[in-house]
Amino acid sequence: MTQSVCILGVTGSIGRSTLKILGQHPDKYSVFAVSAHSRISELVEICKQFRPKVVVVPEQKIAELKTLFAQQNISDIDVLAGQEGLVDIASHTDVDIVMAAIVGAAGLLPTLAAVKAGKRVLLANKEALVMSGEIMMQAARDHQALLLPVDSEHNAIFQSLPHNYLQADRTGQPQLGVSKILLTASGGPFLNHSLEQLVHVTPQQACKHPNWSMGQKISVDSATLMNKGLELIEACHLFSISEHFVTVVVHPQSIIHSMVQYVDGSTLAQMGNPDMCTPIAHALAWPERLQTNVPALDLFEYSQLNFQAPDTQKFPALNLARQAMRAGGLAPTILNAANEIAVEAFLMERIGFTSIPQVVEHTLEKLENAAAESIECILDKDKVARSVAQQYISSIGG
């Protein structure tokens, strides 16, 4: 019997990799619903191949999609719009597995809807957990949802932890003999740049990651190390561990995807070629394993693996994220919102690369923190933080 999959963000990098895995295992999985934001022609090609029952696009893309469907004689796919449509497909009774791969805060409500519907949720949208934190984790416990990490680092940590770790008490302290999590970072394309060189970085340069094929936003986040900061917050929530038990290690080759240290002196690592198909396949099939076309790691290709501490003087975003996690409450929401606005401004060449963390720091300092008591107050603070960040960008000439 096949399992029914909903892919939120199907035309993005994670969505396309997910389709690649599903296409290799039609006996195990079928595509029930997909969503896309802007690449409508690509979405139509996906629909022709995988024949989902439902598609969700923004309201302003409905007419374009229906026109293309008519040209291709596609009449058996329901079309829904906007956030309401995303929530509908993420929580649909016919869906078994939800791939949460929408980038940014836009993925929060549909991801939470999938969790509250008790789905197996493959979490690629780190921003949803950064914003909602313990609300999301409590919802997963209350509704018996299975929240499995797809980020290569968190998937590596999950594989390196004891098999029953997620069922351990959520105390903020390491459990079951774990002493520390080592979260690896490639260091991004500007690892060896000077501060002076970083000032002149272009969006085109920032979007060229040395090891991974990714979308624009996450590529820029990787270049600033904000991606690692967001992943640190995500790790703290997923694995119920305080931030001072998580150490970021720069590992330029991206072969070791993260590590877990134990009280007996052991360090367990998950290794593999940098290909998102591996963690996606793992999360889809866990606790079983799926065949993929990813080649096994050839250790003889690597004469050495390098590790170093991150330079937080050059890349202050990492410390900003750590401080936001330490502060708790709505601070991670403010951090994420300001970063999304700053990255968008950088990609539009309104601000420089080194201004991205400045926008985030200003917004964190400007806004008062408070307890994250509900999704409504999180969304309200997200909106305010975006406005403050926009105002600051305008004030510095962006």
UniProtKB/Swiss-Prot annotation:
The protein, known as: 1-deoxy-D-xylulose 5-phosphate reductoisomerase
One of the Pfam families matching this protein, by short name: DXP_redisom_C
Gene3D superfamilies assigned: 1.10.1740.10, NAD(P)-binding Rossmann-like Domain (3.40.50.720)
GO biological process: isopentenyl diphosphate biosynthetic process, methylerythritol 4-phosphate pathway involved in terpenoid biosynthetic process
Residues annotated as binding 1-deoxy-D-xylulose 5-phosphate: K126, S152, E153, S186, H209, S222, N227, K228, E231
NCBIfam families named among the record's database cross-references: Dxr, PRK05447.1-1, PRK12464.1
Residues the record lists as binding Mn(2+): D151, E153, E231
Protein species of origin: Acinetobacter baumannii (strain AB307-0294)
Cofactors required: Mg(2+); Mn(2+)
Cysteine-cysteine disulfides: none
Pathway(s) annotated for this protein in UniProt: Isoprenoid biosynthesis; isopentenyl diphosphate biosynthesis via DXP pathway; isopentenyl diphosphate from 1-deoxy-D-xylulose 5-phosphate: step 1/6
Broad EC category: oxidoreductase
Binding site for NADPH: T11, G12, S13, I14, N125, E127, G215
Task of the protein: Catalyzes the NADPH-dependent rearrangement and reduction of 1-deoxy-D-xylulose-5-phosphate (DXP) to 2-C-methyl-D-erythritol 4-phosphate (MEP).
Family: Belongs to the DXR family.
